[in-house]
Amino acid sequence: MVNPTVFFDIAVDGEPLGRVSFELFADKVPKTAENFRALSTGEKGFGYKGSCFHRIIPGFMCQGGDFTRHNGTGGKSIYGEKFEDENFILKHTGPGILSMANAGPNTNGSQFFICTAKTEWLDGKHVVFGKVKEGMNIVEAMERFGSRNGKTSKKITIADCGQLE
């Protein structure tokens, strides 16, 4: 089985910035990968398209995926509101790692973050389920609109998204 690849077309205040593609590690965390894949395609009738990156901290991460409240308090999974931490096999080894944001153990919904540095203190707390395949330069460009408290200076949105393979 080949791991799925999904893409985000990123916009800044409505202007296209570029495409980021992700490999999803369905071989290691099938349930978590499937949630992100289906939210990227929108095939369940809801998902990431049109949502924003509400929290960007340069040198740390870019967080998004709250398509219900758009501020970090919402979002939902394809399995219902929240689902369990599948496993912690994969680690936060460096830039480009894709991991689930949460509010404590077993509270995965739709929020995720893209690491822009090694974040080993998150190992065992957040489920890593993918990595940037192409477009890390776009993630680095997104970082420039972040701040130390995470507030973004411009609206960073997922203008389009879907599955490539």
Curated annotation (Swiss-Prot):
PTM statement from Swiss-Prot or TrEMBL: Acetylation at Lys-125 markedly inhibits catalysis of cis to trans isomerization and stabilizes cis rather than trans forms of the HIV-1 capsid. PPIA acetylation also antagonizes the immunosuppressive effects of cyclosporine by inhibiting the sequential steps of cyclosporine binding and calcineurin inhibition. Acetylation at Lys-125 favors its interaction with TARDBP.
Domain of life from the UniProt record: Eukaryota
Mutagenesis / variant outcome for changing residue 125 to Q: Acetylation-mimetic mutant; no effect on its interaction with TARDBP
Residues modified to N-acetylmethionine: 1
InterPro entries per UniProt: Cyclophilin-like_dom_sf, Cyclophilin-type_PPIase, Cyclophilin-type_PPIase_CS, Cyclophilin-type_PPIase_dom
GO biological process: activation of protein kinase B activity; apoptotic process; cell adhesion molecule production; cellular response to oxidative stress; endothelial cell activation; leukocyte chemotaxis; lipid droplet organization; negative regulation of oxidative stress-induced intrinsic apoptotic signaling pathway
Annotated positions of the Phosphothreonine modification: 93
Compartments where located: Cytoplasm; Secreted; Nucleus
Record location of the Glycyl lysine isopeptide (Lys-Gly) (interchain with G-Cter in SUMO2) cross-link: 28, 82
Enzyme's top EC category: isomerase
Modified residues (N-acetylvaline): 2
Oligomeric form and interacting partners: Interacts with protein phosphatase PPP3CA/calcineurin A. Interacts with PRPF19 isoform 2 (via N-terminus). Interacts with isoform 2 of BSG/CD147. Interacts with FOXO1; the interaction promotes FOXO1 dephosphorylation, nuclear accumulation and transcriptional activity. Interacts with integrin ITGA2B:ITGB3; the interaction is ROS and peptidyl-prolyl cis-trans isomerase (PPIase) activity-dependent and is increased in the presence of thrombin. Interacts with MAP3K5. (Microbial infection) Interacts with HIV-1 capsid protein.
Family to which the UniProt record says this protein belongs: Belongs to the cyclophilin-type PPIase family. PPIase A subfamily.
Function noted in UniProt: Catalyzes the cis-trans isomerization of proline imidic peptide bonds in oligopeptides. Exerts a strong chemotactic effect on leukocytes partly through activation of one of its membrane receptors BSG/CD147, initiating a signaling cascade that culminates in MAPK/ERK activation. Activates endothelial cells (ECs) in a pro-inflammatory manner by stimulating activation of NF-kappa-B and ERK, JNK and p38 MAP-kinases and by inducing expression of adhesion molecules including SELE and VCAM1. (Microbial infection) May act as a mediator between human SARS coronavirus nucleoprotein and BSG/CD147 in the process of invasion of host cells by the virus.
Name under which the protein is recorded: Peptidyl-prolyl cis-trans isomerase A
Provenance organism: Homo sapiens
Top-level taxonomy: Eukaryota, Metazoa, Chordata, Craniata, Vertebrata
Gene expressing this chain: PPIA
